Amino acid sequence: YKLLVTNYQSPISTSTLALSEVEGFHFPLSTISWLLLTALWLLLSGIGGYAFQNWDHNWRNVVLRDLMNFNWPVYYAQPESGPVKMLVYYVGFWLPSALIAKFTNWQIANFALFAWSLLGLLLVTHQLASALKTSNFKATLLLIFFSGLDILGTLFFPQEYPTLFPPITHLEAWAGNLQYSSFTTQLFWVFNQAIPA
C-alpha cells in the first residue's frame, strides 16, 4: 500500500499535490485522478450497496450475509429435500470482508467489501498499466470502456431482444450462449469473478 500511495511516479505527469505537511507524503496529481476514477467506477457498480444494485447482487449479498451469520464452512441442512448442501464461493474474494463482518455489522461488512474490491481494482489497473507501459489512469479508462464489439453483432444479427434503443439492455444475446462481456459489465454483475480473475 505504501508503495502505491507514496512512491508512485507517473510516467506522464510529474506534478504533485501536497496533502499533508509531513515530509514525503505527496501524491502525484495523476495518482489522485486514478484513485478517484477507480473509486467512482466501483461506487457505480453497486458493490457495498452505495448505489443501485442490479438483480444479480441478490445472490452476492446472500453469500456475504451467510458468511457473516453462520459458522464456517457454511452448509445448509434440509433433510426433507436431500443431502446437506455447502455454500460455494470464491474464498479469496469473500472471506476478508466476511471475517470483518463476523465481529461488526452489515454496514461495516459492505464497506469492507467495497474497500477490498477497490484494492483489487487498484492492483489490477496498476499491473495493466505496468504491462502496457502507460499511466494507471489510462489503464483504468481502458478497462472501463473496452468491450467485445457486441454492438456490431447486434446491428448485423438483429433479434427482438436486445434493442439498441433505449440503451438499457444487454447486447450479448445476439450470439446465443456465447458472451464476451466488457469488464464494466462483469464488474457490475459478477464482480466476485471479475476482480480476482
Regions found by a protein language model. Give the residues of each.
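Start-transfer (signal-anchor) and selected internal transmembrane alpha helices
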Residues: 1-16, 21-43, 130-141
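Active-site lumenal/periplasmic loops and adjacent helix-entry segments of GT-C-fold
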Residues: 44-196
